[in-house]
Protein backbone atom coordinates (compact mmCIF):
# COMPACT_ATOMS: atom_id res chain seq x y z
CA UNK A 1 0.00 0.00 0.00
CA UNK A 2 2.80 2.41 0.87
CA UNK A 3 5.37 0.93 -1.50
CA UNK A 4 3.47 1.75 -4.70
CA UNK A 5 3.30 5.57 -4.35
CA UNK A 6 6.82 5.67 -2.91
CA UNK A 7 8.61 3.43 -5.39
CA UNK A 8 10.06 6.27 -7.46
CA UNK A 9 11.39 8.42 -4.61
CA UNK A 10 13.67 8.15 -1.60
CA UNK A 11 11.42 10.48 0.37
CA UNK A 12 8.36 9.50 2.39
CA UNK A 13 4.78 10.63 1.77
CA UNK A 14 4.52 14.38 1.06
CA UNK A 15 8.29 14.66 0.58
CA UNK A 16 9.78 17.51 2.60
CA UNK A 17 6.65 19.65 2.75
CA UNK A 18 4.82 20.86 5.85
CA UNK A 19 5.33 18.67 8.94
CA UNK A 20 7.41 16.09 7.07
CA UNK A 21 10.19 18.66 7.06
CA UNK A 22 10.63 18.73 10.84
CA UNK A 23 10.12 14.95 11.11
CA UNK A 24 12.91 14.35 8.63
CA UNK A 25 15.04 16.90 10.47
CA UNK A 26 14.38 15.17 13.80
CA UNK A 27 15.33 11.74 12.46
CA UNK A 28 18.46 13.18 10.87
CA UNK A 29 19.48 14.78 14.17
CA UNK A 30 19.13 11.49 16.05
CA UNK A 31 20.96 9.63 13.30
CA UNK A 32 24.04 11.78 13.80
CA UNK A 33 24.10 11.01 17.53
CA UNK A 34 22.11 8.77 19.92
CA UNK A 35 22.10 11.61 22.43
CA UNK A 36 18.64 13.13 22.80
CA UNK A 37 18.58 16.63 21.36
CA UNK A 38 16.23 19.13 19.83
CA UNK A 39 15.70 18.77 16.08
CA UNK A 40 16.80 22.35 15.34
CA UNK A 41 18.65 23.94 18.25
CA UNK A 42 21.99 22.66 19.48
CA UNK A 43 22.33 21.57 23.14
CA UNK A 44 18.61 21.81 23.90
CA UNK A 45 16.52 18.84 25.04
CA UNK A 46 14.03 17.45 22.51
CA UNK A 47 10.73 19.27 22.22
CA UNK A 48 8.83 16.20 20.98
CA UNK A 49 8.86 12.63 22.36
CA UNK A 50 11.82 10.92 20.76
CA UNK A 51 11.34 7.14 20.90
CA UNK A 52 10.27 6.53 17.30
CA UNK A 53 12.87 8.92 15.93
CA UNK A 54 15.61 7.57 18.21
CA UNK A 55 15.11 3.99 17.02
CA UNK A 56 14.87 5.32 13.48
CA UNK A 57 18.23 6.97 13.99
CA UNK A 58 19.74 3.68 15.17
CA UNK A 59 18.22 1.97 12.13
CA UNK A 60 19.78 4.56 9.81
CA UNK A 61 23.14 4.34 11.57
CA UNK A 62 23.11 0.53 11.37
CA UNK A 63 22.48 0.59 7.62
CA UNK A 64 24.82 3.51 6.99
CA UNK A 65 22.05 5.70 5.58
CA UNK A 66 21.61 9.45 6.05
CA UNK A 67 18.62 10.26 8.21
CA UNK A 68 16.52 11.76 5.43
CA UNK A 69 16.98 8.64 3.30
CA UNK A 70 16.23 6.25 6.16
CA UNK A 71 12.96 7.99 6.99
CA UNK A 72 10.92 6.19 4.31
CA UNK A 73 12.08 2.60 4.94
CA UNK A 74 11.97 3.10 8.71
CA UNK A 75 8.39 4.38 8.49
CA UNK A 76 7.33 1.37 6.40
CA UNK A 77 9.17 -1.16 8.59
CA UNK A 78 7.82 0.27 11.87
CA UNK A 79 4.24 0.47 10.57
CA UNK A 80 4.46 -3.12 9.27
CA UNK A 81 5.80 -4.35 12.61
CA UNK A 82 3.06 -2.52 14.53
CA UNK A 83 0.40 -3.95 12.20
CA UNK A 84 1.73 -7.47 12.80
CA UNK A 85 1.76 -6.93 16.57
CA UNK A 86 -1.75 -5.50 16.49
CA UNK A 87 -3.03 -8.46 14.48
CA UNK A 88 -1.37 -10.85 16.93
CA UNK A 89 -3.12 -9.11 19.84
CA UNK A 90 -6.49 -9.33 18.10
CA UNK A 91 -5.93 -13.02 17.30
CA UNK A 92 -5.07 -13.66 20.93
CA UNK A 93 -8.18 -11.89 22.21
CA UNK A 94 -10.90 -12.96 19.76
CA UNK A 95 -9.42 -15.85 17.80
CA UNK A 96 -7.65 -16.06 14.43
CA UNK A 97 -10.72 -15.85 12.21
CA UNK A 98 -12.21 -12.67 13.66
CA UNK A 99 -8.88 -11.29 14.83
CA UNK A 100 -7.34 -11.36 11.37
CA UNK A 101 -10.33 -9.50 9.93
CA UNK A 102 -10.35 -6.89 12.68
CA UNK A 103 -6.58 -6.43 12.45
CA UNK A 104 -6.82 -5.98 8.69
CA UNK A 105 -9.64 -3.44 9.05
CA UNK A 106 -7.68 -1.41 11.61
CA UNK A 107 -4.58 -1.53 9.41
CA UNK A 108 -6.43 -0.36 6.30
CA UNK A 109 -8.10 2.51 8.17
CA UNK A 110 -4.79 3.52 9.74
CA UNK A 111 -2.96 3.56 6.42
CA UNK A 112 -5.78 5.57 4.90
CA UNK A 113 -5.84 8.31 7.52
CA UNK A 114 -2.58 8.23 9.53
CA UNK A 115 0.15 6.95 7.19
CA UNK A 116 1.74 10.41 6.66
CA UNK A 117 2.46 10.48 10.41
CA UNK A 118 4.18 7.10 10.86
CA UNK A 119 4.77 7.25 14.61
CA UNK A 120 1.07 8.01 15.09
CA UNK A 121 0.18 5.08 12.84
CA UNK A 122 2.35 2.80 14.96
CA UNK A 123 0.53 3.85 18.13
CA UNK A 124 -2.91 3.48 16.56
CA UNK A 125 -2.20 -0.02 15.27
CA UNK A 126 -1.10 -1.21 18.70
CA UNK A 127 -3.27 1.13 20.76
CA UNK A 128 -6.67 0.06 19.43
CA UNK A 129 -6.33 -3.56 20.62
CA UNK A 130 -4.61 -2.33 23.78
CA UNK A 131 -7.76 -0.38 24.66
CA UNK A 132 -9.44 -3.77 25.06
CA UNK A 133 -6.60 -4.83 27.36
CA UNK A 134 -6.97 -1.59 29.35
CA UNK A 135 -10.71 -2.22 29.74
CA UNK A 136 -9.97 -5.76 30.93
CA UNK A 137 -7.37 -4.43 33.38
CA UNK A 138 -9.94 -2.05 34.88
CA UNK A 139 -12.72 -4.66 34.99
CA UNK A 140 -10.82 -7.74 36.16
CA UNK A 141 -11.74 -11.34 35.39
CA UNK A 142 -15.40 -11.98 34.66
CA UNK A 143 -18.15 -11.16 32.20
CA UNK A 144 -18.67 -7.59 31.03
CA UNK A 145 -22.32 -7.73 32.11
CA UNK A 146 -21.27 -8.52 35.68
CA UNK A 147 -19.33 -5.29 36.02
CA UNK A 148 -15.94 -4.84 37.68
CA UNK A 149 -14.64 -7.85 39.61
CA UNK A 150 -13.40 -7.84 43.22
CA UNK A 151 -9.74 -7.00 43.86
CA UNK A 152 -8.73 -10.64 44.23
CA UNK A 153 -9.93 -11.29 40.67
CA UNK A 154 -7.86 -8.49 39.18
CA UNK A 155 -6.09 -9.43 35.95
CA UNK A 156 -2.63 -8.28 36.94
CA UNK A 157 -1.10 -9.25 33.61
CA UNK A 158 -3.55 -6.90 31.89
CA UNK A 159 -2.79 -4.18 34.44
CA UNK A 160 0.96 -4.46 33.83
CA UNK A 161 0.52 -4.58 30.05
CA UNK A 162 -1.74 -1.51 30.13
CA UNK A 163 0.71 0.42 32.31
CA UNK A 164 3.69 -0.47 30.12
CA UNK A 165 1.79 0.50 26.97
CA UNK A 166 0.74 3.89 28.33
CA UNK A 167 4.28 4.55 29.52
CA UNK A 168 5.85 3.69 26.18
CA UNK A 169 3.11 5.59 24.36
CA UNK A 170 4.02 8.75 26.28
CA UNK A 171 7.56 8.52 24.87
CA UNK A 172 6.22 8.27 21.31
CA UNK A 173 3.31 10.70 20.97
CA UNK A 174 1.85 12.76 23.82
CA UNK A 175 -1.43 13.54 22.06
CA UNK A 176 -2.38 9.92 21.48
CA UNK A 177 -1.29 9.00 25.00
CA UNK A 178 -3.78 11.58 26.29
CA UNK A 179 -6.43 10.01 24.06
CA UNK A 180 -5.73 6.51 25.37
CA UNK A 181 -5.59 7.69 28.99
CA UNK A 182 -8.79 9.70 28.52
CA UNK A 183 -10.52 6.63 27.13
CA UNK A 184 -9.36 4.65 30.16
CA UNK A 185 -10.87 7.32 32.43
CA UNK A 186 -14.19 7.15 30.55
CA UNK A 187 -14.23 3.36 30.85
CA UNK A 188 -13.54 3.72 34.57
CA UNK A 189 -16.48 6.10 34.93
CA UNK A 190 -18.74 3.62 33.11
CA UNK A 191 -17.67 0.87 35.50
CA UNK A 192 -18.29 3.14 38.50
CA UNK A 193 -21.80 3.88 37.26
CA UNK A 194 -22.35 0.16 36.76
CA UNK A 195 -21.26 -0.52 40.34
CA UNK A 196 -23.53 2.25 41.64
CA UNK A 197 -26.50 0.81 39.74
CA UNK A 198 -25.81 -2.65 41.12
CA UNK A 199 -25.60 -1.31 44.67
CA UNK A 200 -28.83 0.66 44.25
CA UNK A 201 -30.65 -2.32 42.79
CA UNK A 202 -32.88 -3.59 45.61
CA UNK A 203 -34.48 -6.31 43.51
CA UNK A 204 -31.76 -8.70 44.67
CA UNK A 205 -30.83 -8.94 48.34
CA UNK A 206 -27.31 -7.94 49.36
CA UNK A 207 -26.57 -11.31 50.96
CA UNK A 208 -27.52 -13.09 47.72
CA UNK A 209 -25.21 -10.83 45.73
CA UNK A 210 -22.38 -11.46 48.21
CA UNK A 211 -22.95 -15.22 48.07
CA UNK A 212 -22.97 -15.12 44.28
CA UNK A 213 -19.67 -13.24 44.23
CA UNK A 214 -18.09 -15.68 46.70
CA UNK A 215 -19.13 -18.57 44.49
CA UNK A 216 -17.09 -17.16 41.62
Task: Go through each PLM region and give its residues.
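Juxtamembrane/transmembrane-helix boundary motifs in multi-pass membrane proteins
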Residues: 63, 67, 71, 149-157, ...
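Active-site lumenal/periplasmic loops and adjacent helix-entry segments of GT-C-fold
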Residues: 2-124
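Membrane-embedded helix bundles of polyisoprenyl
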Residues: 1, 76-192
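Generic low-polarity alpha-helical segments
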Residues: 60, 134, 175, 215-216
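Short hydrophobic "helix-edge" motifs at membrane interfaces and signal-peptide entry regions
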Residues: 54, 162-164, 211, 215
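Perimembrane helix-loop-helix junctions
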Residues: 180-216
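Hydrophobic residues in alpha-helical segments
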Residues: 30-31, 138, 193-196
Amino acid sequence: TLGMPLGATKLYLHGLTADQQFRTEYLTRLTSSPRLADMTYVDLPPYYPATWFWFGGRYADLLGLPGWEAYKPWAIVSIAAAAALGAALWNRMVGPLIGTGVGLAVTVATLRYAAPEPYAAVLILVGVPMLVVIAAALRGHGRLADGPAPLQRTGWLSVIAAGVFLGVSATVYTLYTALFAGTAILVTLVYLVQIWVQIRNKAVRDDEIAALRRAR
